[in-house]
């Protein structure tokens, strides 16, 4: 979603702020909204409708294969597996599910001890139902642990099913992939994130402005967990959701400043563009944050298509140089110079 240019200075709020932080009683514990509003049923999950519908078929028919769900963070991979387990096992969920985070428990000992012991346990379940072992962030497991897991999956295939969630399925060894149904999740769209945010805002009675919601969606980049965390953090800190407060909490280069910098490049005004870059640099933002936001703003910036293609090519080239650790401020200043050069009228010979 494009961040609208409101014509006001980024440091100014778009609306009058009410009284700050909502009052909370001493010792009151606020459950994170990510957990409070975590879906409990498959039909409550936002986005990835085709993949979720396959899981609903598994839940109805009962005989689930081993599954791998791969996709970006915050798209509902672990939640989908938990909803599937809840639909399949019902009241037996507590006894028949083992949940492990493979980024902590990543060694071969975990497969030999925890997983093997759970797979050997006897649990009475209805026909066509199996115990479920959930391995979150399975792409963090060592190769040795994955090799050991392959044999365990074969031995206990009559009683136990494995559900793996990971960001990159190519980090799971081929023998495990061939034993599983691989489901792929994609980033959520801005509209899907907005729908869920509005649902939470209504229930929590959160005051907001449209530019505040756009700022949350801009910073989340299709990650629902990030969006809800940013919403709750802004509400807890300021009691009001507007773009100024959101960017204070998220502490990213403000897109209106970045937009202004790109506009100066389009106008071939390198001096003004560099002033904004130097300002962002002195605020302490990392080069990756600055270059990433330049790219995200450039994608929706109103300019000629051929010029946008040239800009994105130069931004990508500079990002590569910055990632290699080459003097970052110099590289970004060079980027501004090249962007200005793209828009300058050719000099008559």
Curated annotation (Swiss-Prot):
GO MF terms held by the record: ATP binding; ATP hydrolysis activity; DNA binding; DNA clamp loader activity; enzyme binding; single-stranded DNA helicase activity
SUPFAM superfamilies documented for this protein: P-loop containing nucleoside triphosphate hydrolases, post-AAA+ oligomerization domain-like
CDD domains attached to this UniProt entry: AAA, HLD_clamp_RFC
Highest taxon, organism lineage: Eukaryota
Modified residues (N6-acetyllysine): 158, 299
Subunit architecture: Subunit of the RFC complex, an heteropentameric complex consisting of a large subunit RFC1 and four small subunits RFC2, RFC3, RFC4 and RFC5; the RFC complex interacts with PCNA. Forms an heterotetrameric complex with RFC3, RFC4 and RFC5; this complex has ATPase activity but is not stimulated by PCNA. The heterotetramer of subunits RFC2, RFC3, RFC4 and RFC5 interacts with RAD17. RFC2 also interacts with PRKAR1A; the complex may be involved in cell survival. Interacts with DDX11.
NCBIfam families listed in its UniProt record: PRK00440.1
Protein name: Replication factor C subunit 2
Name of the gene this protein is made from: Rfc2
């Amino acid at each position: 979603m494009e961040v609208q240019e409101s014509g006001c200075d980024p440091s100014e709020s778009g609306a009058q702020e009410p009284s700050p932080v909502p009052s909370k009683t001493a010792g009151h514990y606020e459950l994170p909204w990510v957990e409070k509003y975590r879906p409990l049923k498959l039909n409550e999950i936002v986005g990835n409708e085709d993949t979720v519908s396959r899981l609903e078929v598994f839940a109805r028919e009962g005989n689930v294969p081993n599954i791998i769900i791969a996709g970006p963070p915050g798209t509902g991979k672990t939640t989908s597996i938990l909803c599937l387990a809840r639909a399949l096992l019902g009241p037996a969920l507590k006894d028949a599910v083992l949940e492990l985070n493979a980024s902590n428990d990543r060694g071969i000992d975990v497969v030999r001890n925890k997983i093997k012991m759970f797979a050997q346990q006897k649990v009475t379940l209805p026909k066509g139902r199996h115990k479920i072992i959930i391995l979150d962030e399975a792409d963090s497991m060592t190769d040795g642990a994955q090799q050991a897991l392959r044999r365990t999956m074969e031995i206990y295939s009559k009683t136990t099913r494995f559900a793996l969630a990971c960001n990159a399925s190519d980090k799971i060894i081929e023998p495990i992939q061939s034993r599983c149904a691989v489901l792929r999740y994609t980033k959520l769209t801005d509209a899907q994130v907005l729908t869920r945010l509005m649902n939470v805002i209504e229930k929590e009675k959160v005051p907001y402005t449209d530019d505040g919601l756009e700022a949350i969606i801009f910073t989340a980049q299709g990650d629902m967990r990030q969006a809800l965390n940013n919403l709750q953090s802004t509400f807890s800190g300021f009691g009001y959701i507007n773009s100024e407060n959101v960017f204070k909490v998220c502490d990213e280069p403000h897109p209106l400043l970045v937009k202004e910098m790109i506009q100066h490049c389009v106008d071939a005004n390198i001096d003004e563009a560099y002033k904004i870059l130097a300002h962002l640099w002195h605020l302490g933002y990392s080069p990756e944050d600055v270059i990433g936001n330049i790219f995200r703003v450039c994608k929706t910036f109103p300019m000629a298509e051929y010029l946008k293609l040239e800009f994105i090519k130069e931004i990508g080239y500079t990002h590569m140089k910055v990632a290699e650790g080459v003097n970052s401020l110099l590289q970004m200043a060079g980027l501004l110079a090249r962007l200005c050069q793209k828009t300058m009228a050719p000099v008559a010979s």
